[in-house]
Regions:
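A conserved FAD-binding loop/helix module that cradles the flavin
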Residues: 119-159
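Structured catalytic cores of enzymes that bind and process phosphorylated ligands/cofactors
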Residues: 58-62, 66-67, 71-73, 116-119, ...
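Glycine-rich beta-alpha-beta "Rossmann" dinucleotide-binding loop(s) and their flanking helix/strand
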Residues: 64, 69-102
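FAD-binding beta-loop-beta segment adjacent to the flavin cofactor pocket
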Residues: 94-117
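Short secondary-structure boundary/capping segments
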Residues: 1-4, 49, 63, 107-110
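A conserved short coil-to-beta-strand element within the FAD-binding core of flavoproteins
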Residues: 42-56
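Beta1-alpha1 glycine-rich phosphate/pyrophosphate-binding loop at the start
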Residues: 1-23
């Protein structure tokens, strides 16, 4: 499940105020289906292991195995990390509050190892809906953390808060 599931957006460019994260996720999947019908979406499966090498990975899920030339992992920073084959890359999250016990994959500019990339908070970034482009989003959360006296920030409102 995505962290967006519990979010509410009141000040995100192009998104109406009060939009729920759960609605945004559903609309995004519908948009992907309608705009890119040739892209296969895999629902209800969880990756349990990644093996092989760049250009010839085997991604094993709880239901099937898939072949991939490149793998992008963007599953959040929850602990424990349960994808076999990547355990040696797991480190404490460098930008999350230590008491949250979050993890990231060790990477250089998102590259974990040849052919495997981490994105979002799993790559060591802070969580933010895409309202700034490129590295500007990371810079924005760095500045917000500075303004917040060094306390890491999550940049979206949440229901019930």
């Amino acid at each position: 499940a995505s962290s967006l599931q519990n979010a509410i957006f009141n000040n995100a460019y192009g998104i109406p105020a009060g939009k729920l994260g759960s609605e945004l996720l559903d609309e995004s999947l519908e948009h992907l289906t309608n705009s890119y019908p040739h892209v296969q979406q895999i629902h209800g499966e969880k990756v349990v292991s990644i093996s092989g090498e760049a250009g010839n990975f085997i991604v094993t899920t709880n239901k099937s195995s898939l072949q991939a030339k490149i793998v992008v992992i963007a599953i959040g920073s929850g602990n424990p990390f349960t994808i076999e084959g990547l355990e040696s890359f797991v480190i404490p999250h460098q930008k999350a509050a230590p008491e949250k016990n979050r993890i990231q994959l060790k990477n250089t500019d998102h590259l974990v190892t040849e052919g495997i990339y981490a994105a979002g908070v799993l790559a060591g970034h802070r969580s933010q809906l895409s309202i700034a482009a490129g590295s500007g989003a990371s810079v924005a959360t760095d500045i917000l953390t500075f303004w917040n006296n060094g306390n890491p920030v999550q940049v979206h409102d949440a229901l019930g808060k």
